[in-house]
Amino acid sequence: MAGQGDTEVRIILVGKTGNGKSATANTILGRRQFDSKICANAVTKTCQRAYREWKGKNLVVVDTPGLFDTKETMKTTCFEISRCVLYSCPGPHAIILVLRLDRYTEEEQKTVALIKGLFGEAALKYMIILFTHKEDLEDQSLDNFVSDAGEKLNNIISQCGKRYLAFNNKAALDEQENQVQQLIELTEKMVAQNGGSYFSDKIYKDIDSRLNHCLEELKETYAQQLTSEIERIEKEYAAKLEKGKAAQIVFAQRNHDEKLRNLKEKAEETVFMYIFQKIKEILSKLWDELW
């Protein structure tokens, strides 16, 4: 999208409910942004986005709910995937599959299959496996843990280019920051191996184009509204004393500035249903196979 520089790093967190996606997001953000609790019901019910300025980079972290919760309908799942695509536009630098060290299920395989089904095999070139509960390794190295893991888990790791790391989301702040450093370095290395650019495909390019078009239309509309409002104020005060005119113009300008601050969100709202329909078309073909 317009206005986004090379310093932005967009990260999507995916995985099974309870694997620690929100806790991992909070570690990356350096603050408690998302609720993260050990409970029977998922804390994250909808796709969420948050930002952090970190060592000259603008991190965009997208936290997602468990997409394979059996109670969810296809409509709800389409909505969440659509939000994920919208929040990570024009494309993610990293898709992080969050796993627990002590728990690997069929849902992780389905998540990878879903990503391939939606975005193609090329998306796997941007995937990283992130294990939570690093503290449970104790004296064992992560490499040894992976080498001793079962065939299914190693198959997933291989599909993701054998890119993996582990987080202890309860660690002291300095250790958490070291983990973030490790993740960003792994992401940058992966992006460099992929030609130096973030992941993009037909869906992302289409949506980014529509968002940019919508942004320009909104800017033009808001500028016209401001001009019309100032002209109205000028006419109203033409036959009156100047007192109050300046305040009216300042108010109109502030209203215009507020609209510009919310420009991105307004554009996203405008194109959301288009994204939803595109995702629904693809997901309807995968639904019976994966759910």
From Swiss-Prot:
Keyword Nucleotide-binding: yes
Domain AIG1-type G: 6-208
Residue numbers spanned by region G2: 42-46
Residues engaged in binding GTP: T17, G18, N19, G20, K21, S22, A23, K37, H133, K134, E135, N169
Tissues with expression: Expressed in thymus (in thymocytes), spleen (in splenocytes), lymph node and lung.
CDD domains per the UniProt record, alphabetical: AIG1
A GO term, aspect molecular function: GTP binding
Region (G4): 132-135
Region (G1): 15-22
Entry annotated with the keyword Transmembrane helix: no
UniProtKB keywords: GTP-binding, Nucleotide-binding
InterPro entries (UniProt xref): G_AIG1, GIMA/IAN/Toc, P-loop_NTPase
Domain of life, source organism: Eukaryota
Residue numbers spanned by region G5: 168-170
Region span, G3: 63-66
Similarity comment: family membership: Belongs to the TRAFAC class TrmE-Era-EngA-EngB-Septin-like GTPase superfamily. AIG1/Toc34/Toc159-like paraseptin GTPase family. IAN subfamily.
Name assigned to this protein: GTPase IMAP family member 9
